[in-house]
Amino acid sequence: MLAGLITETDIQKRAMFADASKDEHGHLRCGAAVGVGPDYLDRAKALVSAGADALFIDAATGHTTRVMDVVSNLRKLTDRPIVAGNVVTAEGASDLIKAGVQAIKVGVGPGSICTTRVISGVGMPQFTAIQEVASVARPAGVTVIADGGIRYSGDIVKALAAGADLVMLGGLLAGTEESPGKVVHYQGRHFKQYRGCLLYTSPS
């Protein structure tokens, strides 16, 4: 009876990617995002069936009745971790925690590609926002994710010092050779197209 099979490729991958995040079956972990539109529940069911390890709820502003309802309904659907946001206040974080999230994304408008502050007139400096959210998330054992505003390596340190458990990097990595995306040649320079979570097309 065959109990398992290990190939040379498996050994090479383990050596090359020793820090890869894998589940108990050795599969790479994968999170998937759903919006808050009418079909979010069907999409979430399909993603969970496909093996998504976590569900991210994408919304420009996370402290809304709609987002709270979506979190509550997804919590009934699955025990997979739910990540929601974005919020910038302790009150917003507290409401998301009550709704059933395991992690909260912090930041309204600090990202290099984000226009939420300009369009809606709502936002808060990222350091202050992280402190606000962490003040209620940390005691509750909920992960704090700093989303946006990371332009220099020092910004990562500042986010962690403010209370974030981890940071999301978009624009900082989007222009690297390793990142996916169409290369655009303009005035003798190379650029890459990249998109924000809630945008269909965005310039680089």
Positions of PLM-derived features:
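Alpha/beta enzyme core
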Residues: 2-9, 13-144, 153-166, 171-174, ...
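Alpha-helical transmembrane segments of multi-pass membrane transport proteins
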Residues: 30, 183, 188-192
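Active-site pocket-lining/capping segments in soluble small-molecule metabolic enzymes
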Residues: 195-196
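Conserved small/polar residues in nucleotide/adenosyl-binding loops
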Residues: 200-204
